[in-house]
Amino acid sequence: LRWLLHRPLTDDEIRKNWNTSRLDEAIKMFPKNCIYMRWHYEDPTVLSHQMLLKWYHKNGLNVMGATAAATGETPFMPRNNSRAQYIKDFCKLVSQNQLKGILATAWDDASAHWETVMRGLIAQGEYSWHPDGRTVDEFIRAHARREFGLSGQQMEFLTEMEKAAFFFDQALVVSGTRNPAWGVSETFRLLDLPDSEKPGEWKRKYQGRLDTVRIESARYEKICKGLKVAEQAALRNRYTLDIYKQTNELFHYPVKLLEVLEVYDSTKNDEERLQALVRIGDVCNSFKSMRAEFEKTYS
């Protein structure tokens, strides 16, 4: 059944291929006096997952659900409102299928700091207690008020940061993946550098990516303004805001690098190229100070 649970199939395809006959026979050998864990980190409402939970319940297995406040696929920061909708939906299914509770994992290869994961863990507490209660939007506003003394609008910078994180993941990558959860894939390759003998070619090659850079640069400025407002208005948990601030600088670094590489590729003579190289050097050197401040804040 594994392939039915982890492939993008239609409901009709799932129903057509669903077959538990081997499991129905093997269940006779399953131990009874234990708790079985049902790990599912993404959307728990997919039909295959719901059918499996019903199979557990039908066969009288003691099952505990396990969702995630952070996974290895999202370095430095969870995404999608701290995964609150996934958590809420799984908690509701736990109630409907009479499972023996639910926990939320938080993988440290996904986020280097507890503060970036905490909102997801609070969502787990919220929805495991009352899955039919607040909507995710209502939860996000309540979290802002109770954890920081801020309005939902004053915490909108965090939604923008989660969006920025997606570009950060692949900003400098053209194929494969580099991920702390499972290492570097064999197909991993970074983008090429501009060729001074072929000005403009690099820009044409990566035009789509550079268009996104301009969007992300504007997003960075928006996040900075939002963080400044939050820092001025917050009544508590200011350290969490410090963590967000440094994480925002990290997410912005590849944007700055791509911007100066585009400048270099657009130069028309040696003097302009030398000036562009100085700017590239400044950005590269700034990584050390950015990293030092990042590590100081995180530690």
Regions found by a protein language model. Give the residues of each.
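Substrate-binding groove of N-acetylhexosamine-processing glycoside hydrolases
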Residues: 1-299
